[in-house]
Swiss-Prot record:
Its main location: cytoplasm. It comes from the Bacteria. ATP binds at residues 9-12, 52, 56, 159, 165, 168. GO terms for cellular component: cytoplasm. GO terms for biological process: 'de novo' CTP biosynthetic process; UDP biosynthetic process. Pathway: Pyrimidine metabolism; CTP biosynthesis via de novo pathway; UDP from UMP (UMPK route): step 1/1. Keywords: ATP-binding, Cytoplasm, Kinase, Nucleotide-binding, Pyrimidine biosynthesis, Transferase. This is Uridylate kinase. The lineage of its organism: Bacteria, Pseudomonadati, Bacteroidota, Cytophagia, Cytophagales. Inhibited by UTP. GO terms for molecular function: ATP binding; UMP kinase activity.
Length: 235
């Protein structure tokens, strides 16, 4: 395996499948099996899931809800998604722990860095819910922060597209996919890979990002085996 310890970032929208809202159980099962394939190879896995399939804090103002309140609602949405994925993983025999950026003691552990690393060393999959625990920070930023804290070797951003393109491939048939791009090049070209806070955290800590299609069977394992899948962003 090319990477020993990873952070996998999944969008909440990906869990919807073909639905317009909520969680598609078939997507959960498929993702769980993809994750099991790399867990069986001895990879230490941490996961951050977005909450956009349930609620987006940034949209709160449009509905008359205070932005900070909306962000906390979004954090709770990520915990719901983590719990759903946790169940899917445990149903196929994987040992997991869910850690939250806010205290929800009856449901999950609070995030403690040393404890998270110890769980990984014991072979458990660790999921990080509730973002950073602070409003105004995205789950991409939470993914970057947690990856740095637990000393992950790479952030794998599983999406519904197979990498980063020179232009929107749905609008421009001549668009080509980058196999590798530097942080500075991505910034100069205005490529929307992550929000700027998340992106800068990765750059300043020399943490590479791989953007790949999580919905293509076997892709996650291929990334870990070092195959040229998706787009690698590095210094």
């Amino acid at each position: 395996m090319k990477y020993k310890r990873i952070l996998l970032k999944l969008s909440g929208e990906a869990l919807m499948g073909e639905q317009k809202y909520g969680i598609d159980s078939q997507v959960l099962i498929r993702y769980a099996n993809e994750i099991k394939a790399i867990a069986d190879k001895g990879v230490e896995i941490t996961i951050v899931v977005g909450g956009g399939n349930i609620y987006r804090g940034i949209e709160a103002a449009a509905t008359g809800i205070d932005r900070v309140q909306g962000d906390y609602m979004g954090m709770l949405a990520t915990v719901i998604n983590c719990m759903a994925l946790q169940s899917a993983l445990e149903n196929i025999g994987l040992d997991t722990r869910l850690m939250s950026g806010i205290k929800i003691e009856q449901v999950c552990e609070s995030f403690i860095r040393r404890r998270a690393i110890r769980h990984l060393e014991k072979g458990r999959i660790v999921m990080f819910g509730a973002g950073t625990g602070n409003p105004y920070f995205t789950t991409d930023t939470a993914a970057s922060l947690r990856a740095i804290e637990i000393e992950a070797e790479v952030v794998l951003k599983g999406t519904r597209v197979d990498g980063v393109y020179t232009a929107d491939p749905e609008k421009d048939p001549t668009a080509t996919r980058y196999t590798t791009i530097t942080f500075d090049e991505a910034y100069a070209k205005g490529l929307n890979i992550m929000d700027m806070t998340a992106f800068t955290l990765c750059k300043e800590n020399e943490l590479p990002i791989i953007i790949f299609d999580m919905n293509r069977p076997g892709n996650l394992l291929k990334v870990l085996e070092g195959e040229s899948v998706g787009t690698l962003v590095k210094l």
